[in-house]
Amino acid sequence: MICLLIITLLFGILFPVNADSSLYERGRAYFYGDGVEKDYEKALLAFEHAAKTGDLDALTAIGIMHIVAIGVEQNDEKGLEYLNKAANQSHPKAQYYLGAMYYLGIGVPLDLDKAFSWISLSANQNYLFAQHNLAEMYENGKGVTKNLEKAYEYYLIAARKDSVESQIKIAEMYKEGIGTVKNIEKSEYWLKRIEELKGMSQ
């Protein structure tokens, strides 16, 4: 099952730490209660001001807040409007979330072709979650003709960025010779890498 649960992606992914805009940073601070009292309404206001300056991270944040109903009434139509603005300006996170909406049929008719199109654009801009999910779409023939070699290619890209889900897939593909030549040594390498990452997170 493709991992496109937007609510899970809000925290730590939607609002990256290294955003340049001070207005955006102010909104992020209010969203998380970082140095100030947590206040979603003030966060939304700051994001709206940042969006007026052309901040695409802010546009994406506003879109998701409307869709998930954080600090504002739930409004898929308005949320999609903001996501579309950012996605059409080649913002990889917005493209990914928009693809997720089409994949899940949230606020729009379910459309796997459009989901694949947006997620592919995001993946090709090196957005990690899009790369993993694009691999899943290739593996399962969702929105695209099933292609295990392409699935392997994108899983490997994401695995090298320490996506544990992708590493599990790559280990399995090497073990069984799925989408690539069977290679037990490489399978064991990735299984070992997964254990190393688990140890680092403890």
Where in the sequence are the language-model features?
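Structural signature of tandem alpha-helical TPR/SEL1-like repeats
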Residues: E37-A46, E73-Y82, P109-W118, T145-Y154, ...
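Short helix-capping/linker turns of helical repeat alpha-solenoids
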Residues: Y32-D34, K52-D55, V68-I70, N75, ...
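N-terminal leader/linker segments that initiate helical-solenoid repeat arrays
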Residues: L14-E41, L45, E196
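Bacterial N-terminal signal peptides
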Residues: C3-I13
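Hydrophobic face of amphipathic alpha-helices that form TPR/SEL1-like repeat modules
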Residues: S22-Y32, A46, A61-V68, Y97-L104, ...
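Terminal, low-structured helical/coil segments at or just beyond the last alpha-helical repeat
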Residues: I168-Q202
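Canonical positions in the second alpha-helix
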Residues: H49-A50, K85-A86, L121-S122, I157-A158, ...
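Helix-start (N-cap) detector for alpha-helical repeat units in TPR-like alpha-solenoids
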Residues: D20-L23, L56-A58, P92-A94, L128-A130, ...
